Amino acid sequence: MATSDSEFNSDLLLAHKLPETRYTYNERDVAIYALGIGACGQDAVDSDELKFVYHRNGQDLIQVLPTFASLFTLGSLTEGLDLPGFKYDPSLLLHGQQYIEIYRPLPSKASLINKVSLAGLQDKGKAAILELETRSYEEGSGELLCMNRTTVFLRGAGGFSNSSQPFSYKNYPSNQGLAVKIPQRQPLTVCEERTQPSQALLYRLSGDYNPLHSDPEFAKLAGFPRPILHGLCTLGFAIKAIIKCVCKGDPTAVKTISGRFLTTVFPGETLITEMWLEGLRVIYQTKVKERNKTVLAGYVDIRGLSSSL
């Protein structure tokens, strides 16, 4: 059950303003992130992926993968939020879904101001579903670069409602981030990529230091035989595959990303991403080859395609 210093008050909760956060990165961070989601992991001179890590005319010219934007939200949830009458244990947090809108190509370095707001909260009895929206603005120009909506499942945080009707709040369009229906026909294209045994250790260098992904003893206490791969790392692999196979290698073609995390991936497993094109939307699902399990599903909206696809 959720614990609180005062009785839960929905009016106080909805009026509560979350503090702004700052995020600064440079070309080195961009390259480390790309390596963390498998760029050049199969072929160090793959021209489709080398551009995310290196540019002969200077690192400031490397291209940025759109899922790099997911890093801008780091810390908001894992460190715990000060919400009136609602507390949770960050160690019991499970990442359920990530939704990202990209408004302009991400620069290779930037200082950002993140404006964070509550997008949703639902009391599920023994657990709660919490959604945060983060809008990232370039410091100086004030230009809005992107928006993240992070959905997490909080074990043990439910039961905070002070009426017989479970508390439920959602503040975004109902058509955003919906679960996708996977087409029954054969996919347009399929990408297979093996993760490295050290993949989680490499990905954590981008700032997600949750010991669930690195500490064997911590993973066992959480019920896993060994450390698991970050869900956002799996998402990065999938979107990178879509950029390569559908967007002809152009990361700026990605407009919207939605991904639901269905089960865990272990570092070293092989990811198979299947893709279907419906207008300007790519529906995808990612499976673990070794266990034949679907681990991720969602969609990507793109800005346009050449007629030769």
From Swiss-Prot:
Which residue intervals define the domain MaoC-like in the entry?
A: 183-295
What is the species of this protein?
Arabidopsis thaliana
- BP term (GO), one: fatty acid beta-oxidation, unsaturated, even number
GO molecular function annotation: lyase activity; oxidoreductase activity
Q: Which InterPro entries match?
A: HotDog_dom_sf (IPR029069), MaoC-like_dom (IPR002539), MFE-2_N (IPR054357)
Report one GO cellular component.
Answer: peroxisome
Task: Look up the EC number in the record and give it.
Answer: 4.2.1.119
This protein is called what?
Answer: Enoyl-CoA hydratase 2, peroxisomal
Q: Is Signal one of the keywords UniProt gives this record? A: no
Function, please? Bidirectional monofunctional enoyl-CoA hydratase 2 involved in the degradation of even cis-unsaturated fatty acids. Devoid of 3-hydroxyacyl-CoA dehydrogenase activity.
Gene assigned in the entry: ECH2
Motif, Microbody targeting signal: chain positions: 307-309
Question: Where does the entry say this protein is expressed, by tissue?
Answer: Ubiquitous.
| Reactions listed under catalytic activity | a (3R)-3-hydroxyacyl-CoA = a (2E)-enoyl-CoA + H2O
Q: Which UniProt keywords apply?
A: Fatty acid metabolism, Lipid metabolism, Lyase, Oxidoreductase, Peroxisome
Q: List the pathway annotation.
A: Lipid metabolism; fatty acid beta-oxidation
Which residues take part in binding substrate?
Answer: 95-96, 124, 208-213, 231, 261
Which cellular compartments is it found in? Peroxisome
Enumerate the CDD domains for this protein.
Answer: HDE_HSD
Q: Which Gene3D superfamilies match?
A: Hotdog Thioesterase
- Per the record, the major location class is other
